[in-house]
Structure formats: C-alpha cells, structure tokens
Amino acid sequence: MDGLVELIEQKKKRQSKSRDSDVNGTLPVETSPSANWFSQMSTSKSNKKVPLSSVTSIIDGLKRLYIQKLKPLEVTYRFNDFVSPLLTNSDFDAKPMVMLLGQYSTGKTTFIKHLLKSSYPGAHIGPEPTTDRFVVVMSGPDERSIPGNTVAVQADMPFNGLTTFGTSFLSKFECSQMPHPLLEHITFVDTPGVLSGEKQRTQRSYDFTGVTSWFASKCDLILLLFDPHKLDISDEFKRVISSLRGHDDKIRVVLNKADQVDTQQLMRVYGALMWSLGKVLNTPEVARVYIGSFNDKPINEHVIGPIGKELFEREQEDLLSDLKDIPKKACDRRINEFVKRARAAKIHAYIISHLKKAMPAMMGKAKVQQRLIDNLGDEFAKVQREFHLPAGDFPNVDQFREVLSGYNIDKFEKLKPKMIQGVDDMLGYDIPDVLKKFRNPYD
C-alpha cells in the first residue's frame, strides 16, 4: 500500500511540472475554454465551430469532436433514450473509477477501507447485508456524505445520467467525500450486496442491473469479489455479470477472505469458482483471479501456512500494480470508450433509419410498426448485412424492443449520410490527429 501512495505522489509532482509546459494530456476544469459548450446547442447555425487546431489536450480534443460531430448524430436518432445519456463536460473531466461488485459480506467496503487505510463517511461493515446503497467514495475538501438527488444535479460531477433511474434509485445513492491522496486520482464505487433470493430482488424499487451497467460503462476497473463460503452465483448476480457485456477487459475477479480455508480447501474453492465463472462469463479468455485477504488484519498463517502467505502477498502486489496503472491508462481508456460510443451511435443510427424506411407512407402504419417490433432480430440482421457490420456490436434485442415499443417509428429520422460521414472522418482522421499532437500526461 505504501508503494501505491508513493507512486501517486510522484505522479502528482510530475503533473504540477507539466502544467508549465505547452503540451499536456489533461485539462484543468477551471481553466477549460470549453466549460460552456454543453450548455449550447451544437446544431445551431449561429454557433461557430472551433477548429481542432486550437485544442490544448487530448481530453479537450475529444470534447470538441463530441460537440461538433458525435452529439448531433446522437440527438437526431435519440441515442440517449435507447442506449446512454448525452455526455456532459464532467464526463470527460472525471477521475478514473473502480467499481466493486459481489454478494453481501464478501468484503467490498472493507477492501476500500484497506486501500484508504481509514474508514470513509457512511461506511458500514458487518456479517449481514450492511451496504444498502450505491456509495461513490471520492476526494473532497472535508469528510461528508452528499445525498443522491443532490449529487445527480451537480454539474461538476459525472452522475447526471443517473437521473434516468428515478427518485427511487437516487434515494439509495450517495457520495462520500474525504481528503485523501489516493482519492485525488481514483474514485471508488461501493455497491449493495447482490441478493440471492428472487423475492428479495423483486423488492428492489429500482433497476439494479441497469444501474450497474451504467456504472460499468463509466468505470476503468470492475472488481468481482467472492467469498470462499459464498461461491454460488445467484440469478441476480448472473444478470449483473451479463450486463457487463462489452466491458470484459475491465473485469478482475478477487477471491477474498481466502485465509479462512487451508491450502487443500483453497485449491478446491479456486476450481469451483473458475467452473462457476465459466458458465457466466461468455468469453473464451480466462478471467484474472486474485487470491488474498484484503483487510487490515494480518494474514492467518496458522491456517494457510508459509507457502500460502507468500502467495497472498504476491497476489496483493499484482492487484495493487493493476490499481497503480489506472491513472496512467485513464487517458487511453477515455479514447477507447469514446470510440466505442461513436461506433455504437453509428449502428443505432443505421437501425433507426432502417426502421423508418420500412414504414409505409400512408395506410397500415400501426400494423407494420408492430410487425417490426415483433421481428426486431430479423431487422437487425438486415441492417447487419446491408452495412456489413459486426453482429457483436449490435444492442441487446429485448432491451431495444422494450424501449422501441414506447415510440412512434414513423416520427424517426431517415438516414443522413453527411452525419455518418462526419463520424467516420472523426474516427479515421480527427482522433488520430489529436493523438499525434498530444501525449499521455503520465508517460
């Protein structure tokens, strides 16, 4: 842990030096010339487009490209209603986030306390399901807890998109702020324990899986925590893991509290965990599993022996090195997520315009709309063949159908080739030009 804090301090010093130079990869929020872009309509003819030659960093360049080329496409084809809310200034300037997921009492809150070496406002620990809300642990001038409704409307925080989940969720969401050197570079998301019973799951007053998916798209690392005594993956946990589709590169598995079993039992537990994950993670690659006991107590060497202690220490070092790399990779992750979003918006535009094209001009619109909704999978296949798109990039059919049923397809826009070409140019030329011009601030 000392090495993690030292590295953060070194990077902090390098950042303060790099602010004096002309070229850097980050943009302070207070001096950003683009602070008011998101309050303006980019599609207005009176607005003059700012040339990309005047950008001052990679993040600045992504902001301008989003406003000028990607946001008009998203607004035209209602991407924000179907897939993801429109991005705001704070989404680009946000610190890297790490989300912890797992069943109750697998050590999620204790894990954060272990990294911070102190408790945080609103932290509750116990053998029963203690964390009953989503808690964002981030840097702040003093220790305090901010209610979810307040957090969601603050322009300088990247949580405006959570308003789509309603007041019932926001009452189960809060932000915990405290001054800490680690939190100046990384934000943690503590989640409620995933429930094992179907009855308890249905009593949640909000879309738990949807909220998890929203956070997954914003996070830089997702830690799935397991307890040696809780290896079963419940139906809700399966749905949660399935909602992480498309973010496989962010997922790490942590077998926590592993010093509660001896070496022979640990081998069996590890095998059972890998078997369970193999049925849920639909990927041929093997997920990275860290074994250890991530709390402030000394490792129970009496149970696991000297070999187990050495293994746990090395595993902990590997996990900490993964966490150390997060700020360094944050800029690359922003670019990666931006490109993924642009491709998703393009495919969404193709789908919406295809459905609009299939509608009749005069009679029988209601019947045709119902047929299109019922056979949405076939329509996706037609779009895929027409535009030569990868099948894996298409949205979930059932979720898309659920949202689509509330709209009048005839009101959708036809395909606008100029907008599509603008996004293609952005992916093919503008983003590579920005990357050539600026460097990662942590390099």
Residue ranges of model-derived segments:
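Switch/connector loops and helix/strand junctions flanking conserved nucleotide-binding motifs
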Residues: 2, 145-148, 196-198, 232-234, ...
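Conserved G1/Walker A P-loop phosphate-binding module
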Residues: 2-11, 24-188, 196
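Short linear motifs centered on serine/threonine within intrinsically disordered regions
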Residues: 12-21
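Alpha-helical interaction elements in eukaryotic regulators
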Residues: 54, 58, 62, 107-108, ...
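Short amphipathic alpha-helices and their capping/turn residues within compact interaction modules
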Residues: 67, 71, 78, 103-106, ...
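Short coil/turn segments at secondary-structure boundaries
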Residues: 78, 112-117, 127-128, 149-152, ...
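Conserved C-terminal guanine-recognition region of P-loop GTPase G domains, centered on the G4
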Residues: 161-195, 202-285
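C-terminal end of P-loop GTPase domains and the immediately downstream helical coupling element
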Residues: 258-259, 264-442
